[in-house]
Amino acid sequence: MSSGRIVQIIGAVLDVEFNRNEVPKIFDALLVDGTETTLEVQQQLGDGIVRTIAMGSTEGLKRNLPVTNTGGPISVPVGIGTLGRIMDVLGRPIDEEGPVQADERWSIHREAPSYAEQSNSTELLETGIKVIDLLCPFAKGGKVGLFGGAGVGKTVNMMELINNIALKHEGLSVFAGVGERTREGNDFYHEMQEAGVVNTEDFSKSKVAMVYGQMNEPPGNRLRVALSGLTMAEYFRDTKDPATGKGRDVLLFVDNIYRYTLAGTEVSALLGRMPSAVGYQPTLAEEMGMLQERITSTQSGSITSVQAVYVPADDLTDPSPATTFAHLDATVVLSRDIASQGIYPAVDPLDSTSRQLDPLVIGEEHYNVARGVQEVLQRYKELKDIIAILGMDELSEEDKLVVYRARKIQRFLSQPFHVAEVFTGAPGKYVPLRDTIASFKAIIAGEYDSLPEQAFYMAGGIDEVVAKAEKMKSSAA
């Protein structure tokens, strides 16, 4: 292993000088002697000098400190030993539960599976959330993006998906917290403990591994923590489960993929690269592709990923969310307008899309009901201007009926969440897909035209709506 010395420190960027014959390779991990600081080589400047990004604080470092080349990229522990643990970008435990008991370590920089190794799946993944299951269904082994501005419910939606999928799904999950609030990471850990997904008595019985690089971390950590989490998920996908002899089906949750882009922007600026549109790094598409192409399903197992995507200033054409769109199978767009009406989850039923919304995949009935719901909502959207100017009285009887049904559909797309019970006091509801399809089919057919629209708000199944309407009727009488 070659050794060098620090010659320059500018924030998180350090230049290290090595003997010209022993210059480290790009992405090699370097260790600063006498500290716990790890550096990752980003550029070779010539004359034996490499430019690196620190994976941690550079406080206390100074010029001429000796640095050792590890001879390989950053590696993280993988396998059953990671379950139930919270780790940082380097795989070090941060939950104060002792060292991670792992037999293997894998490099975080890996090749994406080849075209021949990949496999496609059309199997649906039921989430129990009506609006998602009906209008933007998820595929097992697919990639899903939750798009939304600040405060419209990305993290709450993701927590509910974890609650509904990960708790019912018998497989394993990996949660990568990329540049989000430490409080949210802490809440998530305690919720997982209460749900029994993290078993602190016997970690091997846990179902989730957690990797955190939070908001207060240096940009190097936030840039690489998604790769650390992905590497752990890849291990579960690619290695055989002793029970089945096949790779596993893994769930990968990333909150928030925008912070990954943002960390790349910071690192790019620190390295002196010329910025591109809106100040983003010129390598934005490449960096996003390197991450997303690895999140895929192979012949041995699958990775189903759910990624929260912050949308700056609610602008979906911003380069960061726009680049992310291209990689996803389903996009769930959260709308501030819908949130302002008090309808949660605030999913935009006309903006959200899924590759699975195809009659050959989901069946004719589901497809026709989903399109019928969207047609009613689209017509209501077109009529809103007329209603605002002339009022409801100027509409034809047919259009009035569309408006009444659309308002009921809008309210019925809301749903109480399990993870929000502590705030709302309303018990969470899981609605099976077949019930969702039957309920909306009946609403657009006019079977519930007689019920008041308030009865549809924050209900689970249609039976609950009927019961609410009866209660309202009896209390009014």
Swiss-Prot record:
It catalyses: ATP + H2O + 4 H(+)(in) = ADP + phosphate + 5 H(+)(out). Keywords: ATP synthesis, ATP-binding, Cell inner membrane, Cell membrane, CF(1), Hydrogen ion transport, Ion transport, Membrane, Nucleotide-binding, Translocase, Transport. It comes from the Bacteria. GO terms for molecular function: ATP binding; ATP hydrolysis activity; proton-transporting ATP synthase activity, rotational mechanism. Pfam families: ATP-synt_ab, ATP-synt_ab_N, ATP-synt_VA_C. F-type ATPases have 2 components, CF(1) - the catalytic core - and CF(0) - the membrane proton channel. CF(1) has five subunits: alpha(3), beta(3), gamma(1), delta(1), epsilon(1). CF(0) has three main subunits: a(1), b(2) and c(9-12). The alpha and beta chains form an alternating ring which encloses part of the gamma chain. CF(1) is attached to CF(0) by a central stalk formed by the gamma and epsilon chains, while a peripheral stalk is formed by the delta and b chains. Belongs to the ATPase alpha/beta chains family. This is ATP synthase subunit beta. It comes from Psychrobacter cryohalolentis (strain ATCC BAA-1226 / DSM 17306 / VKM B-2378 / K5).
